[in-house]
Amino acid sequence: MSASRFIKCVTVGDGAVGKTCLLISYTSNTFPTDYVPTVFDNFSANVVVNGATVNLGLWDTAGQEDYNRLRPLSYRGADVFILAFSLISKASYENVSKKWIPELKHYAPGVPIVLVGTKLDLRDDKQFFIDHPGAVPITTAQGEELKKLIGAPAYIECSSKTQENVKGVFDAAIRVVLQPPKQKKKKSKAQKACSIL
Protein backbone atom coordinates (compact mmCIF):
# COMPACT_ATOMS: atom_id res chain seq x y z
CA MET A 1 0.00 0.00 0.00
CA SER A 2 1.44 3.38 -0.97
CA ALA A 3 1.87 6.19 1.54
CA SER A 4 -0.81 8.83 1.42
CA ARG A 5 0.09 12.28 0.18
CA PHE A 6 0.41 15.04 2.79
CA ILE A 7 -1.53 18.24 2.09
CA LYS A 8 -0.89 21.34 4.18
CA CYS A 9 -4.05 23.45 4.35
CA VAL A 10 -3.85 26.88 6.01
CA THR A 11 -6.90 28.96 6.99
CA VAL A 12 -6.68 32.74 6.67
CA GLY A 13 -9.11 35.65 6.94
CA ASP A 14 -10.16 38.47 9.25
CA GLY A 15 -10.47 37.89 12.98
CA ALA A 16 -13.87 36.58 14.15
CA VAL A 17 -15.03 35.33 10.72
CA GLY A 18 -15.14 31.75 12.03
CA LYS A 19 -11.87 30.13 10.91
CA THR A 20 -11.25 28.32 14.19
CA CYS A 21 -14.91 27.29 14.50
CA LEU A 22 -14.76 25.89 10.96
CA LEU A 23 -11.72 23.77 11.88
CA ILE A 24 -13.21 22.60 15.19
CA SER A 25 -16.54 21.82 13.52
CA TYR A 26 -14.77 19.78 10.82
CA THR A 27 -12.43 17.87 13.11
CA SER A 28 -14.73 17.19 16.08
CA ASN A 29 -18.30 17.67 14.80
CA THR A 30 -18.89 20.17 17.61
CA PHE A 31 -19.46 23.92 17.60
CA PRO A 32 -17.67 26.06 20.20
CA THR A 33 -20.14 28.52 21.73
CA ASP A 34 -17.61 30.99 23.17
CA TYR A 35 -15.37 33.20 21.03
CA VAL A 36 -11.78 32.31 21.83
CA PRO A 37 -9.36 33.86 19.32
CA THR A 38 -7.38 31.12 17.61
CA VAL A 39 -7.04 28.20 19.95
CA PHE A 40 -6.72 25.31 17.55
CA ASP A 41 -3.81 22.92 17.57
CA ASN A 42 -2.49 21.90 14.20
CA PHE A 43 -4.42 18.83 13.18
CA SER A 44 -3.62 15.96 10.86
CA ALA A 45 -5.88 13.14 9.66
CA ASN A 46 -6.24 10.71 6.81
CA VAL A 47 -9.13 11.73 4.57
CA VAL A 48 -10.54 9.93 1.52
CA VAL A 49 -11.69 12.13 -1.36
CA ASN A 50 -12.66 10.67 -4.75
CA GLY A 51 -11.12 7.34 -3.73
CA ALA A 52 -7.73 8.90 -2.91
CA THR A 53 -6.43 8.89 0.66
CA VAL A 54 -4.56 12.00 1.73
CA ASN A 55 -3.07 13.08 5.02
CA LEU A 56 -4.65 16.49 5.57
CA GLY A 57 -2.74 18.86 7.82
CA LEU A 58 -4.81 21.82 9.05
CA TRP A 59 -3.18 25.04 10.23
CA ASP A 60 -5.10 27.86 11.85
CA THR A 61 -3.94 31.48 11.77
CA ALA A 62 -4.90 34.59 13.70
CA GLY A 63 -6.54 37.24 11.53
CA GLN A 64 -5.97 40.12 13.93
CA GLU A 65 -3.50 42.81 12.87
CA ASP A 66 -1.32 42.09 15.93
CA TYR A 67 -0.22 38.92 14.12
CA ASN A 68 0.61 40.45 10.71
CA ARG A 69 4.34 39.74 11.11
CA LEU A 70 3.97 36.32 12.73
CA ARG A 71 1.18 34.83 10.60
CA PRO A 72 3.15 34.44 7.32
CA LEU A 73 5.53 32.01 9.07
CA SER A 74 2.78 29.38 8.85
CA TYR A 75 2.45 29.87 5.07
CA ARG A 76 5.68 28.04 4.22
CA GLY A 77 4.98 24.74 2.50
CA ALA A 78 1.24 25.38 2.18
CA ASP A 79 -0.46 23.38 -0.59
CA VAL A 80 -3.77 25.26 -0.37
CA PHE A 81 -5.31 28.17 1.51
CA ILE A 82 -8.84 28.41 2.81
CA LEU A 83 -9.56 32.15 2.67
CA ALA A 84 -12.61 32.81 4.85
CA PHE A 85 -14.90 35.79 5.15
CA SER A 86 -18.18 36.15 7.03
CA LEU A 87 -21.41 36.23 5.03
CA ILE A 88 -22.67 38.80 7.54
CA SER A 89 -19.62 41.12 7.46
CA LYS A 90 -19.06 43.40 4.49
CA ALA A 91 -15.68 44.47 5.94
CA SER A 92 -14.38 40.88 5.98
CA TYR A 93 -15.65 40.42 2.40
CA GLU A 94 -13.84 43.57 1.24
CA ASN A 95 -10.63 42.59 3.05
CA VAL A 96 -10.35 39.44 0.92
CA SER A 97 -9.13 41.52 -2.02
CA LYS A 98 -7.73 44.48 -0.03
CA LYS A 99 -5.64 42.60 2.54
CA TRP A 100 -5.56 38.82 2.15
CA ILE A 101 -4.94 38.35 -1.56
CA PRO A 102 -1.97 40.79 -1.55
CA GLU A 103 -0.56 39.04 1.54
CA LEU A 104 -0.93 35.53 0.08
CA LYS A 105 0.43 36.54 -3.33
CA HIS A 106 3.46 38.10 -1.60
CA TYR A 107 4.29 35.24 0.79
CA ALA A 108 2.93 32.22 -1.11
CA PRO A 109 2.61 33.00 -4.82
CA GLY A 110 0.95 30.31 -6.91
CA VAL A 111 -0.65 28.44 -4.00
CA PRO A 112 -4.35 27.81 -4.77
CA ILE A 113 -7.04 29.50 -2.68
CA VAL A 114 -10.48 28.15 -1.80
CA LEU A 115 -12.77 31.08 -1.00
CA VAL A 116 -15.19 30.35 1.84
CA GLY A 117 -18.19 32.33 3.09
CA THR A 118 -18.85 31.44 6.74
CA LYS A 119 -21.86 31.89 9.06
CA LEU A 120 -24.35 30.83 6.38
CA ASP A 121 -26.94 30.12 9.08
CA LEU A 122 -26.99 33.83 10.05
CA ARG A 123 -27.38 35.25 6.54
CA ASP A 124 -31.10 34.39 6.46
CA ASP A 125 -31.65 35.01 10.18
CA LYS A 126 -33.96 38.05 10.33
CA GLN A 127 -33.54 38.35 14.09
CA PHE A 128 -29.75 38.65 13.70
CA PHE A 129 -30.14 41.67 11.41
CA ILE A 130 -32.70 43.25 13.76
CA ASP A 131 -30.19 42.84 16.62
CA HIS A 132 -27.27 44.06 14.45
CA PRO A 133 -28.66 46.93 12.32
CA GLY A 134 -25.29 47.73 10.67
CA ALA A 135 -24.70 44.18 9.43
CA VAL A 136 -25.00 43.65 5.67
CA PRO A 137 -25.47 40.14 4.24
CA ILE A 138 -23.22 39.00 1.39
CA THR A 139 -25.09 37.17 -1.39
CA THR A 140 -23.98 34.02 -3.18
CA ALA A 141 -23.65 36.09 -6.36
CA GLN A 142 -21.26 38.48 -4.59
CA GLY A 143 -19.21 35.51 -3.40
CA GLU A 144 -19.03 34.08 -6.92
CA GLU A 145 -18.02 37.51 -8.24
CA LEU A 146 -15.22 37.73 -5.67
CA LYS A 147 -14.09 34.20 -6.58
CA LYS A 148 -13.64 35.32 -10.20
CA LEU A 149 -11.94 38.56 -9.16
CA ILE A 150 -9.28 36.78 -7.10
CA GLY A 151 -8.96 33.78 -9.44
CA ALA A 152 -9.97 31.18 -6.85
CA PRO A 153 -10.84 27.74 -8.28
CA ALA A 154 -13.67 27.25 -5.76
CA TYR A 155 -16.17 29.22 -3.66
CA ILE A 156 -18.19 27.53 -0.92
CA GLU A 157 -20.65 28.86 1.65
CA CYS A 158 -20.92 27.00 4.95
CA SER A 159 -22.15 27.08 8.53
CA SER A 160 -19.94 25.64 11.26
CA LYS A 161 -22.90 25.84 13.64
CA THR A 162 -25.24 23.66 11.55
CA GLN A 163 -22.37 21.75 9.84
CA GLU A 164 -23.84 22.67 6.44
CA ASN A 165 -21.14 22.30 3.76
CA VAL A 166 -18.29 22.10 6.31
CA LYS A 167 -16.98 18.83 4.86
CA GLY A 168 -17.43 20.30 1.37
CA VAL A 169 -14.95 23.09 2.19
CA PHE A 170 -12.14 20.66 2.98
CA ASP A 171 -13.05 18.25 0.18
CA ALA A 172 -12.77 21.19 -2.24
CA ALA A 173 -9.39 22.15 -0.79
CA ILE A 174 -8.10 18.60 -1.26
CA ARG A 175 -9.51 18.39 -4.81
CA VAL A 176 -7.84 21.67 -5.80
CA VAL A 177 -4.47 20.19 -4.78
CA LEU A 178 -5.00 16.71 -6.28
CA GLN A 179 -6.61 17.95 -9.52
CA PRO A 180 -5.45 21.52 -10.09
CA PRO A 181 -7.62 23.47 -12.53
CA LYS A 182 -6.05 23.62 -15.96
CA GLN A 183 -4.41 26.95 -16.65
CA LYS A 184 -5.63 28.65 -19.79
CA LYS A 185 -2.67 28.82 -22.12
CA LYS A 186 -2.36 31.64 -24.55
CA LYS A 187 -0.63 30.48 -27.68
CA SER A 188 1.36 32.99 -29.59
CA LYS A 189 1.44 32.85 -33.36
CA ALA A 190 5.02 31.61 -33.21
CA GLN A 191 3.94 28.53 -31.24
CA LYS A 192 1.24 27.56 -33.71
CA ALA A 193 3.55 27.32 -36.69
CA CYS A 194 6.03 24.50 -37.10
CA SER A 195 9.16 25.07 -39.14
CA ILE A 196 11.51 22.35 -40.25
CA LEU A 197 14.92 23.51 -41.41
From Swiss-Prot:
Lipid moiety-binding region (S-geranylgeranyl cysteine): C194
GO molecular function, a single term: GTP binding
Residue ranges of the propeptide: 195-197
Pfam name, any one: Ras
BP GO terms, sorted: abscisic acid-activated signaling pathway; auxin-activated signaling pathway; small GTPase-mediated signal transduction
Listed name of the protein: Rac-like GTP-binding protein ARAC1
Coiled coil: none
Domain of life: Eukaryota
Keywords noted in UniProt: Cytoplasm, GTP-binding, Lipoprotein, Membrane, Methylation, Nucleotide-binding, Prenylation
Gene Ontology cellular component list: cytoplasm; nucleus; phragmoplast; plasma membrane; spindle
Known partners and oligomeric status: Interacts with SPK1.
Keyword Transcription regulation recorded: no
SUPFAM superfamilies listed in its UniProt record: P-loop containing nucleoside triphosphate hydrolases (SSF52540)
Modified residues (Cysteine methyl ester): C194
Residues noted as binding GTP in the record, renumbered to the chain: 13-20, 60-64, 118-121
Family: Belongs to the small GTPase superfamily. Rho family.
Subcellular location: Cytoplasm; Membrane
InterPro entries: P-loop_NTPase, Small_GTP-bd, Small_GTPase, Small_GTPase_Rho
Motif (Effector region): 35-43
Main location: cytoplasm
Gene expressing this chain: ARAC1
Record carries keyword Transmembrane: no
Tissues where this protein is expressed: Ubiquitous.
